Swiss-Prot record:
Keywords: Phosphopantetheine, Phosphoprotein. It comes from the Bacteria. The keyword Ion transport does not apply. The keyword Phosphoprotein applies. Residues 1-78 form the Carrier domain. This is Probable acyl carrier protein PigG. The lineage of its organism: Bacteria, Pseudomonadati, Pseudomonadota, Gammaproteobacteria, Enterobacterales. InterPro entries: ACP-like_sf (IPR036736), PP-bd_ACP (IPR009081). GO terms for biological process: antibiotic biosynthetic process. The modification O-(pantetheine 4'-phosphoryl)serine is found at S36. Involved in the biosynthesis of 4-methoxy-2,2'-bipyrrole-5-carbaldehyde (MBC), one of the terminal products involved in the biosynthesis of the red antibiotic prodigiosin (Pig). Carrier of the L-prolyl group transferred from L-prolyl-AMP by PigI. Disruption phenotype: Cells lacking this gene show a white phenotype and produce 2-methyl-3-n-amyl-pyrrole (MAP).
Length: 87
């Protein structure tokens, strides 16, 4: 499941492997878990794991604010691949 893979990835990359308190609704920017530079790591992870094309127009903090918002982005892009743009 993408949600658990994302949580594990975020914990490994940004929290020294610590998942306590990290769930699908944790506000990643508000808690300084990720910053704007980390979005590109997350984009790469989502592209590899989900095989979706994420265009530049989709790369903004609202789509990466929580694990839940990233999963929703992937689901939307899978349902409407024309919205993704170039990979």
């Amino acid at each position: 499941m993408l949600e658990s893979k994302l949580i594990n990835h975020i914990a490994t990359q940004f929290l020294d492997g610590e998942k306590d308190g990290l769930d699908s609704q944790t506000p990643l920017f508000e808690l300084n878990i990720v910053d704007s530079a980390a979005i590109f790591d997350l984009v790469d992870f989502l592209r590899q794991e989900s095989k979706v094309s994420i265009g530049m127009q989709e790369i903004h903090p609202a789509n990466f604010a929580t694990v839940q918002s990233m999963v929703a982005l992937v689901q939307r892009l899978k349902a409407h691949p024309e919205q993704g743009g170039a990979a």
